[in-house]
Amino acid sequence: MAYRESFYRFLMTQRNPGSADDIAQFANNAQHDSSFPKQEEDYEKLSDYLELNAGYLPSMSVFDKAYQLYLDNMN
């Protein structure tokens, strides 16, 4: 089985403190979330965590877009 990086590691490549882009802002804020499941790859587990704990995420559609980029990057 091929190595697959965690969603968090991928998300950290999207950081851009000066950007107004939704995914960049998500990444910037997730970096400061000490409870973020950093080793997780599973959509449902990540989604559950974010719905309950990520007040910094304005909409789950931002996560959906970021997760799709993650999947596209893994293929």
UniProtKB/Swiss-Prot annotation:
Domain of life: Bacteria
InterPro entries per the UniProt record, alphabetical: UPF0346, YozE_SAM-like, YozE_SAM-like_sf
Short name of any one Pfam family annotated for the protein: YozE_SAM_like
Transmembrane segments: none
Family classification: Belongs to the UPF0346 family.
Protein name per Swiss-Prot or TrEMBL: UPF0346 protein LGAS_0911
Phylogenetic placement of the source organism: Bacteria, Bacillati, Bacillota, Bacilli, Lactobacillales
